């Protein structure tokens, strides 16, 4: 079924910043998609087009991207006569029209908005749930419910506290199902709230951009201690492990790392990549840390490779790989990490996101699907993670509706699958063995 109409508009994301929403019409109805936006963005990400007009939304408007859709992309896709089930052809047509390496002509936020809407329309055209349509696009016969990685303590660029490292996550790998994982996660989250309140007072339980608590602590080990205490207190020591997103590019200064980067600069307190690696080794020894994302700067390749060779845990590339096949290929060659963080808006189309996922999986990597810190009520990534069988997703704490929208959709998918539903659990790094 060909496209009848495409219309884009500017809406607001969960941080109150403008983002792009796209309505796509076919004979089957209206299909709507909204684009997320990151705070700690890798310099190699596809370009998110902002207006730059300081008189409007402090320069963050997206009317240019919206206009590119309404004036150029929409007429081209409609006149092509392509069916919405032809995802790759439609995505490639947009990439050709843009013609740049990093989507800087139209903006990745313009192309992705249309690409997501096409995918939703394609599923309806086939009379399939979105996750099954995505599985078909990826050539997958399996469907797997992921382990959620709940970001329960926020730091870095996501919170106004002193904490340098950006996310401290809990993964309920011992849960029996996704629904059970949600319960475990929520119970530990509420227990953690009590632990933080008792230690630092009620104002320390304010939440960051992704719904995690943001107590004003400086030591990253203190955050790990709080999470461990909450897990133990909730009674889930055997069922829950810890993940971290360090987002080290945010505090990389002149070849060294500043773990107090939110205070006035002081070169004397900066540490080397080796020293930072030793700190992580301590974390892994002392806490049930099984996954560390972006432990080093996006260009500190030597530190990545050395560290990954020396630890037996999951090392996730985000700013390093930016869901980009060329960066992934280099990371595979240099053995820099062993898991890809998949963010559709880093690369800017559904087709390229699927290709990036397959490339990582073919090289024996894990894949974790991810939200952005600036989110919307769109639930596309919930269906994406099931269809791509990656076995793990991070989309914030069990708090804030733009986060819960994804988790709730995953519970619905699990319910819909019934007996067919399989939960990744302890195999979250390699769910294909299920």
Swiss-Prot record:
InterPro entries xrefs: Enolase, Enolase-like_C_sf, Enolase-like_N, Enolase_C, Enolase_CS, Enolase_N
Residues bearing the modification Phosphotyrosine: 44, 287
Tissues with expression: The alpha/alpha homodimer is expressed in embryo and in most adult tissues. The alpha/beta heterodimer and the beta/beta homodimer are found in striated muscle, and the alpha/gamma heterodimer and the gamma/gamma homodimer in neurons.
Protein name (record): Gamma-enolase
Organism, scientific name: Rattus norvegicus (Rat)
GO MF terms held by the record: enzyme binding; identical protein binding; magnesium ion binding; phosphopyruvate hydratase activity; protein-containing complex binding
Gene Ontology cellular component annotations, sorted alphabetically: cell cortex; cell surface; cytoplasm; growth cone; membrane; membrane raft; neuronal cell body; perikaryon
Entry-annotated residues carrying N6-succinyllysine: 60, 89, 228
Compartment(s) of residence: Cytoplasm; Cell membrane
Note on cofactor: Mg(2+) is required for catalysis and for stabilizing the dimer.
Pathway info: Carbohydrate degradation; glycolysis; pyruvate from D-glyceraldehyde 3-phosphate: step 4/5
Modified residues (N-acetylserine): 2
Keyword Secreted (UniProt): no
Sequence positions bearing N6-(2-hydroxyisobutyryl)lysine: 233
Cofactor(s) for this UniProt protein: Mg(2+)
